[in-house]
């Protein structure tokens, strides 16, 4: 085993996921030194795009595998984590240097639920990644490992002096989330008294309550992204105080809006816009404003991989850093609410059926 570590990328067949794999293959310092585990829901029917990309892995001597993980199933997540942990423990594959939680789910014209009984956006974007991360902590590189969460402006972010997109800012009437969060009941994703179950179970901003309202699905996606950012902050704080895991870094990146299949469950106009128009506009948008709202998957993949491996500008242990593309940014006010974050963490332990001994994180409860 000559590799320095393992890189795991969830959702490797999607637009950004495939671009991340392509960028890893393109970098000589990564393709030969790291073993790749690229997860897809179905390694046959759901992997055509990434399989085409991986056709040239052999020519750059990149050892890798496709691993089936259905993030809509907690049992599937547990099976995959057991498999990875077993192989790291017996030396078949090296410890995890980078765990990139890329997979996502968004829908506007439908409202889907998992067999576990959760809202699909909540489970795929957040809960399954929460479970996978805690289960895999034992297999992380304890000196240099990084866990990377993918954020989104749809949760809220603040770049001082540059941009504001916050569910809690009443003056934000023209921002990209303005119409999503205009109704008073949605100006906080978690209102007091804190209730995470409505979001988890799909009762919050449901299609049944808002038939035909495309913003209902966008809100659920944004709320799931808020949960991911709360997880990123909570986990980075807990890991920092853990004597065995304190050298592991937890980072987050907002990759921006890109041409991808994430919008295929939307109205046909939006699908065509994202599929055919945005790919033409994105390169110009990146040239004009590299970290603006619209970006190419190539640019975003570069930012994601940089956050997972860069030491020159981010340092050896960039724990707790949130990036908007390639720039350090700040999360919104609700993501900083310590009580909400703790409540979500504790409730998520119940939702994911996590028990003592499942994770090596000392402050797991």
Swiss-Prot record:
Family matches, as Pfam families: adh_short
Coiled-coil residue windows: none
Keyword field: Glycoprotein, Membrane, NADP, Oxidoreductase, Transmembrane, Transmembrane helix
Biological pathway: Mycotoxin biosynthesis
Recorded GO MF terms: oxidoreductase activity
Superkingdom of this protein's organism: Eukaryota
Protein topology in the membrane: Single-pass membrane protein
One Gene Ontology CC term in the entry: membrane
EC number of the protein: 1.1.1.-
Location of the protein in the cell: Membrane
Chief location bin: membrane
Residues carrying sugar: 90, 291, 324
Spans traversing the lipid bilayer: 267-287
Binding, NADP(+): 16, 52, 70, 102, 221, 225, 260
Catalytic machinery residues: 221, 225
Family label: Belongs to the short-chain dehydrogenases/reductases (SDR) family.
Function: NADH-dependent flavin oxidoreductase; part of the gene cluster that mediates the biosynthesis of ilicicolin H, a 4-hydroxy-2-pyridonealkaloid that has potent and broad antifungal activities by inhibiting the mitochondrial respiration chain. IccA to iccE are sufficient for ilicicolin H biosynthesis and the roles of the remaining enzymes, iccF, iccG and iccH within the pathway have still to be determined.
Protein name in the entry: Short-chain dehydrogenase iccH
Biological source species: Talaromyces variabilis (Penicillium variabile)
């Amino acid at each position: 085993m000559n590799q320095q570590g393992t890189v795991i990328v969830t959702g490797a067949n999607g637009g950004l996921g495939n671009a991340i794999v392509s960028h890893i293959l393109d970098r000589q310092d990564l393709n030969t030194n790291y073993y790749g585990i690229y997860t897809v829901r179905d390694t046959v029917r759901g992997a055509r795009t990434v399989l085409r990309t991986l056709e040239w892995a052999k020519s750059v001597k990149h050892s890798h595998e496709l691993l089936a993980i259905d993030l809509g199933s907690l049992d599937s997540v547990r099976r995959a984590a057991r498999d990875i942990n077993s192989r790291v423990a017996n030396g078949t594959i090296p410890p995890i240097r980078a765990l990139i939680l890329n997979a996502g789910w968004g829908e506007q014209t439908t409202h889907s639920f998992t067999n576990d009984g959760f809202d699909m956006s909540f489970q795929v974007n957040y809960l399954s990644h929460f479970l996978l991360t805690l289960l895999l902590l034992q297999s992380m590189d304890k000196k240099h490992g990084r866990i990377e969460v993918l954020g989104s402006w749809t949760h809220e972010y603040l770049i001082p002096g540059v941009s504001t997109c916050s569910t809690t800012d009443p003056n934000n009437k023209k921002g990209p989330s303005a119409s999503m969060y205009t109704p008073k009941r949605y100006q906080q994703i978690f209102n007091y008294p804190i209730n995470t179950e409505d979001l988890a179970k799909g009762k919050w901003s449901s299609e049944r309550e808002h038939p035909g309202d495309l913003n209902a699905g966008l809100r659920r996606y944004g709320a799931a992204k808020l949960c991911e950012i709360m997880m990123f902050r909570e986990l980075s704080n807990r890991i920092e105080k853990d004597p065995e895991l304190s050298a592991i870094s937890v980072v987050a990146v907002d990759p921006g809006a890109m041409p991808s299949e994430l919008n295929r469950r939307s109205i046909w106009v939006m699908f065509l816009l994202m599929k055919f128009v945005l790919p033409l506009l994105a390169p110009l948008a990146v040239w004009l404003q590299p970290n603006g709202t619209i970006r190419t998957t190539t640019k975003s993949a570069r930012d994601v991989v940089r956050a997972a491996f860069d030491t020159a500008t981010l340092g050896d242990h960039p724990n707790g850093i949130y990036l908007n593309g390639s720039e350090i940014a700040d999360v919104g006010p609700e993501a900083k609410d310590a009580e909400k974050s703790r409540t979500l963490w504790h409730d998520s332990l119940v939702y994911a059926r996590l028990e003592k001994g499942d994770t090596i994180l000392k402050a797991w409860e």
